[in-house]
Design a protein with these regions (language model features):
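Non-catalytic cap/lid and distal C-terminal segments of serine-dependent acyl enzymes
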Residues: 1-250
Length: 250
């Protein structure tokens, strides 16, 4: 790994801002997390619970900033008028990670919250060989409701509500080619997003796709109070299954 000063810092990758966390003692297997942020762009740098877990497990974290892109393969004008968030992650973030940290799939785990939670699942479903390990906290899966409610950015990205629905993470699940390790959780008092997590669980179960989920633990609804509550379980899931992937291919 190229020497980086430990702690949080900001970099520019592919012309866009990106937050990095470097632990004092990185793990010996080049495990690394990519964190996908939510719609309000709140940084993990401000969340001591997550930072402590990353430090404890020796996990570098790369956290790209893509505005309200929903981590899709659609042009989001407030992010970039030429490149989608999906292409940015695949074409710029992954090569940057390999160059700077000598880490590459399947040693890269995805962690996301809210908009980024559905983004983590979306990437894992679309590219299960690249991202076999993903954890989503409060994933905003059925985000077509944002179109219905007049979200201007989503309306700039999609022609109608049905087009959004067809692009949701649930519709990207392949019954024969899925990520080997996925975890998602949602507070049952999260009135806006709990139903879409329940529908996702039902679809995965009906297809026989292995998954872990927690739709029972409650504590704060939708936001960082709940995200912090689920941080330890989510990071532990990622670390344990990155290790399983390493053992599987050695």
């Amino acid at each position: 790994m190229i020497h980086h000063q430990y702690g949080w810092k900001q970099e520019v990758v592919g012309g866009h801002g990106c937050d990095l966390f470097v632990p004092r003692k990185p793990n010996p297997h080049q495990y690394l997390l990519v964190y996908l942020h939510g719609i309000h762009l709140k940084k993990l740098e401000d969340q001591t619970k997550f930072t402590a877990l990353f430090e404890q497990n020796g996990l570098p974290v790369v956290a790209p900033v893509t505005q309200g892109s929903w981590w899709t393969d659609r042009i989001c004008p407030e992010f970039d008028r030429v490149m989608t968030a999906e292409r940015y992650l695949l074409d710029h973030i992954l090569p940057y990670i390999e160059q700077e940290f000598q880490s590459s799939p399947p040693r890269i785990g995805l962690l996301g919250t809210s908009m980024g939670g559905q983004g983590a699942l979306r990437f894992a479903y679309k590219y299960p060989d690249l991202f076999p390990v993903a954890a989503a906290i409060s994933p905003a899966v059925d985000y077509q409701i944002r179109y219905r409610n007049g979200d201007p950015m989503i309306r700039a990205m999609y022609p109608n509500e049905e087009a959004v629905r067809q692009d949701t993470a649930t519709l990207h699940i392949h019954p024969l080619n899925w990520p080997r390790h996925q975890f998602f959780c949602c507070d049952p008092t999260d009135e806006i997003w709990i139903e879409s997590s329940e529908r996702l669980r039902m679809k995965l179960s009906s297809l026989g796709v292995p998954h872990e989920c927690d739709l029972e633990t409650t504590g704060g609804g939708h936001g960082f109070q709940y995200y912090n509550l689920m941080a330890e379980q989510s990071v532990r899931f990622l670390v344990e299954n990155l290790e399983r992937e390493r053992m599987r291919i050695t």
